[in-house]
């Protein structure tokens, strides 16, 4: 059957830049899915998404003009029950009537179990024009649009007003109506660089015509790549690098249809302001790309992406420089104003900054942070006084002008102001880094003082917010407790601190009776669950479960244990030992009395004597290996007792009639279990 490319374009007013790429991809995928379900393409649809500030479009290859005819088989009652005394039963008559057929038109087919009556017919395929309108409308409804709007006198809703609809199959217009618009082959190009309507000649020529006639690079990916290439080229020319993240590049790509990268600058005296402030205002407010020199220092040059191409771009450059100058002047003013007061002198203002109405102000919180940070610093062997001082100043920049304007700079500005106040570099760095890690993959704090304050901050948040009942549920976690827990875990995996003891320290820093008394145990369980999530990114679930079943309170050796268990699992004896361990644990659950020492005089059979001797020899080897952190050695030693374990279970009845003998054998198995599970619960391997 003849196929051609299908093109659909929605011409809109300027779409939300942060959502544009997502909207374009969703629209294209939904259209493709609709075509697949309607069997207008063979197999998976091959499509290209287009998204620019004023349009969403999709191009789908090999779309049929008409569905293929389908053979339909409607199955009815079993032959055995369909006729009575040579006449059709009511069941058969009802089936024929429902199928719109006569009895004589029915056939007999086998349904896999029995012969049944059936009505077979050919359903003629519908043309693309009859199906496409519903497919497009369904795709529009599926778009992830949090807020919709109406325009003019229309009752239709969309993320922005829609003014044009192009629908072409090859070179033919497919007549459909979507959002109150009738399809055509007419669209508009760039708002300023293109003149009049553009007639799309063929679905395949869309991108080329938009580029050549409309001055529009319709592909989001192509525009983004062009911008990135131009930015990097300009930066190389200036012996610089571009300070930009993926989010800024995506947003700028969504703001332009014909990107032109230009170089501009600002007065050098602004560089006296901390570069983080300047970079943030350039990126966040102006969508500019700052430039860094070879030492990572901000230059007084920057790159901007214009949506206009002119022979003389100087007026565009001057206009952008003028706007930025005003922004940087504000930042410079805030910085100078903030220097008129020390961080210490700002602390009283934190009494009026509410952290949470149930657990007080930021000033009250600072008191807790000081005590927790000092405690952790002592445990780390760090300067407790420095940690306490850093914790005292950690939140002071929240009441500065700069952080009031740019909340993202909290901590960063605290570092600069701490330096200006004469605080040590260790304290200044800790003030900045106590928010780290802010997100998955973020850097951990440098040094023990910064780590102590960062741990204190996250522990106080986790325990305090949890303790007043604001527990994360589903996708709701307004105080980011999951993120705080992961940050704590990542830090503790570097240091040998007891996680439960730290939780208790944080809990004790709150006034007695303020928090739920179950908070320490509940948050410890929560941390254990988050640790499993973190580790399962790199290790199989059964290995993680085996290690965490021991409920490790020190996390600095967890990775070594995981690696050891992973190596043990590869041993030929591992599966049998894991099964034996599981059997041992099940038997131990049946013990009537408390388990104790093995009485050698009650060992009757050679197999249990041999196992006891093997366990006796194994115990010091495993204890020494575990003490030295050689977990792989400890686990590999288990392989040596497999023959004795197998022989024991083959020849010894553990649950003997003699109560003393039974208890002694359970004591022996308990001793074996302690050694087998010294590193991890190996019974969980393979589950």
From Swiss-Prot:
Aminoacyl-tRNA synthetase listed as a keyword: yes
GO CC, any one term: cytosol
Enzyme class: ligase
InterPro entries: DALR_anticod-bd, Gly-tRNA-synth_bsu, Gly-tRNA-synth_heterodimer
Reactions the enzyme catalyzes: tRNA(Gly) + glycine + ATP = glycyl-tRNA(Gly) + AMP + diphosphate
Key words, A-Z: Aminoacyl-tRNA synthetase, ATP-binding, Cytoplasm, Ligase, Nucleotide-binding, Protein biosynthesis
Pfam families on file: DALR_1, tRNA_synt_2f
One GO biological process term: glycyl-tRNA aminoacylation
GO molecular function, one term: ATP binding
SUPFAM superfamilies: HD-domain/PDEase-like (SSF109604)
Entry's localization field: Cytoplasm
Cytoplasm listed as a keyword: yes
Its EC number(s): 6.1.1.14
Subunit record text: Tetramer of two alpha and two beta subunits.
NCBIfam families xrefs: glyS (TIGR00211)
Family of the protein in this entry: Belongs to the class-II aminoacyl-tRNA synthetase family.
Annotated protein name in UniProt: Glycine--tRNA ligase beta subunit
